[in-house]
Every structure is written in structure tokens, then in C-alpha cells.
Regions:
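N-terminal donor/sugar-recognition subdomains of glycan-related enzymes
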Residues: 1-146
């Protein structure tokens, strides 16, 4: 049983709430979003953010990127977004789910298994004083697998 869970791939499950076309993710025996309103919690968390100019926003476990449009809409132009994923299967899901070209230009997605790439990006962008602060936001329950 444990071996089956460790080899499991993330599975998209229709939330099935009215006319909603949103999915949730079932992975390693748990849902990473609500089964009924998958985007509700992360959109609410984003709406509560107070983001100042020159902030680096760190998205943890982006999975299906619910909340990204809302986040991009509230960010000052001087802010940047990076997304981090520790689990390889969830990283692949996040890469496949980030379809919008505008979003791809705004967000840099990194695997936590490649710290040198994260370090290079941060050194390149912090040395010129681009960021004065950072905030973290968890986009899914996938953070529990890191």
C-alpha cells in the first residue's frame, strides 16, 4: 500500500459544484484543494494580502495556480513572483497548468531540488535592490509533502 502511494501521480478531480469547471487535485490519499470550491481558500488568502512595492512574492506549491490572476492584479509593477515546488509530480502538474503566456512571463517556477537556480535568480534580482521584502503564500495543501 505504501509503495502505491509513493508512486501515485496527482489526479485531477472535477469539483462538481453547479456550473463550475474547476478541478481539485487528489494526491497521495488527500485532496490538495477543497472538493467543493477549490479556488475559494487561496483567492481569499490573496485578497487579504497587503503587498508593498518591491516585494518578492513566494508561492509555495502552486499546483493549479488558483489565485494567480487575483495576485497579479493586486501587485504593484515593481513586485516579482517566484513559485516553489518540492515534489516532482506536483512540479510537473504546475508546469502543465501554467498556460497563460502573460502569467508565464510574470512568474518564475522553481523546483526546491535545484537550489542553485533559485539562488542565481535571487542573487541576480536582489543585488540591484529590486526587493526590499518577501511574503509567502501557500497555493495548495501540496506544501505538506515538502
Amino acid at each position: 500500500m505504501t509503495e502505491n502511494i509513493s508512486n501515485e501521480k496527482p489526479r485531477l478531480v472535477n469539483a462538481g459544484q453547479g456550473f463550475s469547471i474547476l478541478n481539485t487535485v487528489n494526491y497521495k490519499g488527500r485532496f490538495l484543494y477543497s472538493k467543493y470550491s477549490p479556488d475559494k481558500a487561496v483567492v481569499a488568502a490573496v485578497s487579504r494580502l497587503q503587498v508593498l512595492p518591491q516585494t518578492l512574492v513566494v508561492i509555495c506549491s502552486p499546483c493549479l495556480w488558483y489565485g494567480l490572476n487575483e495576485l497579479c492584479a493586486l501587485l504593484p509593477e515593481s513586485c516579482s513572483i517566484i513559485a516553489l515546488e518540492a515534489d516532482d509530480a506536483l512540479l510537473e502538474l504546475a508546469e502543465d497548468s501554467l498556460l497563460d503566456q502573460t502569467q508565464k512571463l510574470r512568474v518564475k517556477l522553481f523546483s526546491l531540488n535545484e537550489p542553485q537556480k533559485i539562488n542565481e535568480y535571487l542573487l541576480q534580482n536582489t543585488s540591484s535592490g529590486n526587493f526590499k521584502r518577501a511574503i509567502r503564500i501557500d497555493f495548495s495543501a501540496g506544501v505538506s509533502f515538502s
